[in-house]
């Protein structure tokens, strides 16, 4: 069990270095009062209570949030280990189930975003409830309370108590299993009814975002999730959060294999006929969703597939043991060695795939290809730059991203599409990552206002101006007109002379006497070979700001036009 926990931490270690995802920032905005937080029953524990306690305690430091998420994941590994060992009566089976589950690459988004903490919370409460149920006696009476906490962490576990009706190694009759599970089954039914009612009439789980359909999309969604699980070549499962039309061949083949295992290993102590329904019951609530096919939805269902793998290994181990008349046959040792090798190989492959996902950049940029990681990294860069500039004080900030230099990338694939055009319907990655600035205000209380500018706009003279490099890094330019002058100089230095001229001309319309703006504006004419216009603008600088140090430099150069 300890080895499985250590392996889990090693493979999932990169999650500790992450920042906040967009959904994290949205919830933090609710906590600090920048968004209206409507009262809600669903996700009461994982959203309202957790963030209500964590935000005042941890503030904008992302590490403690991720430590809690990873700690919950390790807890689930240990709970799954105990549950499988108790059902399968095999430590080898438990190692396989816990090892495969803990070190999976599928948990990238469940552990990378704090907002998805409902997934590990729900699984922890569910496994805890089932372990108490298995113990019997007074412990069984507490189990429904834990399951209620599971549903209030993530409602998708609502159907899982049905697996308690499946036969176990104890040989209890169906009537006895039904009697023991009745409290949790009734609770499950009540929650399911409430969920259906709230999904129809509630804003939180209703509306277009949670639109449902009950046709061929159910099968297509199931095949999509199945392919994400079984395709070892894909380092980016769930990169496009939508049904994958290519998933059917692989998904269907994997489903046939699963059904075959259910039949072949039906006499196992922990038969696949237990884990397979877990997989399906945990997925059923999300399969009808038309617009949502998210990787983190696999967190709880994948525990069922891990049980299938563990149960099959335990069954093979028992078959090998049954062939010996005395002692432990060599076949058992071989099964155990093979099981450990499978877990280690799976962990190594997952580690490689996660490394690819964390390090791959969009072509021609230093920005992450993965859309969730991309937004998180961009938000971190903005937070670092603004926090350093304000240094604990207050101020207004604006991010300058000239529209003439924008390039449109697909938010799904990260591929460059074309240069941006006016009214194209695109949005800046920076504005999207910061929820139009509200996320930055939630992280830094000293930010009184945040804006995103594509050109000089009147009314921003007292704003601290920032810009963004092709690596996603944000950097301070200066306040108001000074910031635009420096932005113009940067554009000229990178060869973007005409965009610089357009930018500076707009700023000069409000600040015609600002010497740095005028000087950089004159430089744009120099680099396009229009010496007459350059001399004219330098002469205007001398006339409007004769006492500025730049005016002295112009006089010494003798380049200004004389009246």
PLM features: residue spans?
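Polytopic membrane enzymes that build or remodel cell-surface glycoconjugates and lipids
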Residues: 1-482, 486-487
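Start-of-helix register in tetratricopeptide repeats
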Residues: 482, 516, 550-553
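Register position in tetratricopeptide repeats
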Residues: 493, 527, 557-561
């Amino acid at each position: 069990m300890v080895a499985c926990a250590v392996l889990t931490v090693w493979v999932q270690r990169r999650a500790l270095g992450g920042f906040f995802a967009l959904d994290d920032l949205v919830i933090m905005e609710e906590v600090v009062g920048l968004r209206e937080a409507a009262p809600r029953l669903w996700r009461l524990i994982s959203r309202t209570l957790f963030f209500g306690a964590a935000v005042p305690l941890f503030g904008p430091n992302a590490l403690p949030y991720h430590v809690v998420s990873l700690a919950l994941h390790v807890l689930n590994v240990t709970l799954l280990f105990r549950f499988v060992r108790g059902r399968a009566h095999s430590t080898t089976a438990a190692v396989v189930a816990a090892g495969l589950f803990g070190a999976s690459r599928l948990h990238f988004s469940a552990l990378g975003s704090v907002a998805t903490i409902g997934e590990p919370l729900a699984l922890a409460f569910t496994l805890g409830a089932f372990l108490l149920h298995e113990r019997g006696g007074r412990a069984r009476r507490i189990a429904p309370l834990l399951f209620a906490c599971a549903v209030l962490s993530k409602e998708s576990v609502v159907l899982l108590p049905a697996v308690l009706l499946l036969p176990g190694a104890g040989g209890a009759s169906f009537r006895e299993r039904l009697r023991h599970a009745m409290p949790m089954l009734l609770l499950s039914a009540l929650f399911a009814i409430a969920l259906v009612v709230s999904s129809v009439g509630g804003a939180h789980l209703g509306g277009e975002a949670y639109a449902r359909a009950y046709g061929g999309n159910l099968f297509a969604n199931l095949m999509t999730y199945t392919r994400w699980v079984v395709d070892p070549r894909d380092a980016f499962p769930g990169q496009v959060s939508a049904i994958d039309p290519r998933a059917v061949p692989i998904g269907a083949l994997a489903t046939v294999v699963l059904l075959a295992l259910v039949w072949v290993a039906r006499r196992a102590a922990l038969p696949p006929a237990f884990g397979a329904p877990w997989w399906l019951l945990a997925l059923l609530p999300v399969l009808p969703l038309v617009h949502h096919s998210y990787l983190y939805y696999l967190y709880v269902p994948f525990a069922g597939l891990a049980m299938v793998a563990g149960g099959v290994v335990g069954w093979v181990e028992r078959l090998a043991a049954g062939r010996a008349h005395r002692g432990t046959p060599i076949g058992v040792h071989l099964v155990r060695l093979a099981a450990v090798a499978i877990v280690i190989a799976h962990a190594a492959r997952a580690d490689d795939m996660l490394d690819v996902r964390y390090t791959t950049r969009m072509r021609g940029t230093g920005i992450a290809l993965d859309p969730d990681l991309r937004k998180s990294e961009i938000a971190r860069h903005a937070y670092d730059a603004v926090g350093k500039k304000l240094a604990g004080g207050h101020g207004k900030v604006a991010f300058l991203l000239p529209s003439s230099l924008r390039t449109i990338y697909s938010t799904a694939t990260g591929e460059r599409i074309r240069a941006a055009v006016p009214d194209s319907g695109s949005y800046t990655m920076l504005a999207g990552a910061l929820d139009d600035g509200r996320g930055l205000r939630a992280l830094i209380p000293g930010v009184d206002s945040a804006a995103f500018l594509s050109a000089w706009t009147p009314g921003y003279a007292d704003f601290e101006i920032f810009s963004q490099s092709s690596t996603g890094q944000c950097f301070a330019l200066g306040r108001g007109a000074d910031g635009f002058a420096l932005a113009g100089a940067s554009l000229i230095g990178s060869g973007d002379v005409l965009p610089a001229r357009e930018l500076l001309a707009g700023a000069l319309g409000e600040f015609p006497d600002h010497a740095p703006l005028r000087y950089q504006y004159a430089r744009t004419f120099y680099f396009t070979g229009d010496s007459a216009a350059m001399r004219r603008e330098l002469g205007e600088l001398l006339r409007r700001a004769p006492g500025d140090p730049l005016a002295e430099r112009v006089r010494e150069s003798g380049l200004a036009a004389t009246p």
